[in-house]
Every structure is written in C-alpha cells, then in structure tokens.
Amino acid sequence: MTDVQLQNIVTTFGISMMLLIILYHYLSRPQA
C-alpha cells in the first residue's frame, strides 16, 4: 500500500467520522 492510498483512506475516514458526529448532534438536539 502506498502512502497516497493510506492518506486517502485516512482522509476519507476522518471526513466520514466528522459527518457522523455532526449528524448525531443534529439528530440528538432537542426539537424547538
């Protein structure tokens, strides 16, 4: 596995986790 492939995997994983956290906070937020 090359460094570029590894970097792409890490970047994709980081973005996915960030989106999941944002979605979780949005859904868990009490509805006004």
Swiss-Prot record:
It comes from the Eukaryota. It is a single-pass type III membrane protein. Keywords: Endoplasmic reticulum, Membrane, Signal-anchor, Transmembrane, Transmembrane helix. Subunit of the oligosaccharyl transferase (OST) complex that catalyzes the initial transfer of a defined glycan (Glc(3)Man(9)GlcNAc(2) in eukaryotes) from the lipid carrier dolichol-pyrophosphate to an asparagine residue within an Asn-X-Ser/Thr consensus motif in nascent polypeptide chains, the first step in protein N-glycosylation. N-glycosylation occurs cotranslationally and the complex associates with the Sec61 complex at the channel-forming translocon complex that mediates protein translocation across the endoplasmic reticulum (ER). All subunits are required for a maximal enzyme activity. InterPro entries: Oligosaccaryltransferase, Ost4p_sf. This is Probable dolichyl-diphosphooligosaccharide--protein glycosyltransferase 4 kDa subunit. It comes from Schizosaccharomyces pombe (strain 972 / ATCC 24843). The chain crosses the membrane at residues 5-27. Residues 1-4 are lumenal. GO terms for cellular component: endoplasmic reticulum; oligosaccharyltransferase complex. It is found in: Endoplasmic reticulum membrane. GO terms for biological process: protein glycosylation. Residues 28-32 are cytoplasmic. The lineage of its organism: Eukaryota, Fungi, Dikarya, Ascomycota, Taphrinomycotina. Component of the oligosaccharyltransferase (OST) complex. Pathway: Protein modification; protein glycosylation. Belongs to the OST4 family.
